[in-house]
């Protein structure tokens, strides 16, 4: 009996939705969305997924399942108890998802998403995690073509300090989740 399975993790960077909404012609949005269902994996974990039924280019849930049916679990949005939110983390599985759990860290749609998935006779827990971004935009700093002054250095160091503190709390929450897992093999997918 073959118990192997494949896992894919991909940060979608919101499919460049801001540019798409601005000009409706974003090559990034269309390219990412059209490529998703061609990426072969039994379990697909996405971070920063953006789904919208308003625009065909952003119907990501449909696009990923177009060629292969998947069980889908996505971060819930406020007022949406079905787990099929519009933005955040998502787990797609060719195998049945029998249990789900999530922790949401606003305001940036980060958090942890867990799915218990039955593969043959075994159950595994897949945990899709996205920790707080450090908020440092290196390209912005480099593109300004100026010497990084003391003020900019101070700002970068403050962002790093805040990011490490928040990430420490988030990692502790992840450790608590792991400590609660009993009799189930688990894998952690993180961006």
Question: Model regions: which residues?
Answer:
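Active site of divalent-metal-dependent phosphoester/diester hydrolases
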Residues: 70-91, 155-183
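N-terminal secretory/membrane-targeting segments
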Residues: 2-6
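Structured beta-strand-rich core segments of catalytic domains in phosphoester-bond hydrolases
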Residues: 1, 33, 37, 43-141
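Active-site beta-strand/loop signature of hydrolases that rely on acidic residues for catalysis
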Residues: 7-12, 32-58, 115, 126-130, ...
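Acidic/histidine-rich helix-loop elements
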Residues: 9-29, 51, 135-164
